[in-house]
A protein has these predicted regions:
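Noncatalytic, beta-rich nucleic-acid-contacting surfaces in large DNA/RNA-processing enzymes
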Residues: 1-230
Length: 230
């Protein structure tokens, strides 16, 4: 998003919006923000004051499909969860197949206020941040003992880079293959660390044998739970 669009959105923050629909009409009419950019901002919880991102995305898709139209096919009503009786107050006339000359803005404002979606999971939020920001910004005491998997290397004993969702720090750790294979982890997974231990680092010597490196320590996770449904 360029500086012009950022300034336009910042100016809108001076306004009071009673609903997400109010904001969408202003974004559409008063700014140069493109649809894909708006979707990204919703994904990143830029408009969280209006509700959960999944609900806002669903509302935005419907807004895009209907806001510039003046008529609706009767066959479309079921797909948007509206009966003919509910749509009737917003149309000037009706034919066998069409609802014509609709007051689409009033219709949409009413319709969007009723739309709900399954709440966004923590994993969905993390996935969006990594995709669009390139990093995770979550830092919350509620997530004590929980981490997101940033990198996975399974060449030898699985090696992970984890992001602490409590304090925003990253750490490197390992898991033995037997434990890992019982609950395989992928980039973006969320886990609660239940048990850990420290072990010396190892490296290959000149004979190709693995030996411990004196005075070193590595963190090994010995028990964890995957929490992707949060």
């Amino acid at each position: 998003m360029n500086a012009k669009m950022a300034d336009e959105l910042y100016c809108l923050r001076e306004n009071h919006y009673g609903s997400f629909a109010d904001l969408l009409y202003d974004v559409s009419n008063e700014t140069s923000v493109k649809k894909n950019q708006m979707r990204i901002l919703i994904e990143l919880d830029y408009f969280e004051e209006f509700g959960d991102a999944n609900t806002l995305l669903k509302q935005y898709e419907l807004f895009n499909s209907l806001s510039e139209r003046k008529s609706l096919k009767k066959t479309e009503l079921e797909s948007i969860g509206v009966t003919l009786e509910e749509a009737s107050p917003y149309m000037a006339s009706v034919t066998e197949k069409l609802l014509n000359n609709m007051d689409m803005e009033s219709f949409l404002r009413n319709l969007l206020s009723k739309i709900k979606a399954n709440p966004r999971s923590l994993k969905e939020t993390i996935t969006a941040q990594v995709e669009y920001l390139g990093y995770i910004s979550i830092k919350d005491d509620r997530y004590k003992g929980m981490a997101a998997v940033v990198e996975v290397d399974t060449k030898y004993s699985p090696k992970l880079k984890l992001y602490s969702l409590k304090n925003g720090t990253t750490l490197d750790c390992k898991i033995d293959k037997k434990t890992f294979n019982k609950q395989k982890l992928e980039k973006g997974d969320i886990l609660r660390i239940a048990e850990t231990k420290s072990k010396p680092k190892v490296k290959k010597n000149e004979d190709g044998d693995w030996v411990t490196v004196p005075g070193t320590k590595e963190l090994w996770i010995t028990k964890y739970f995957i929490l992707n449904n949060m």
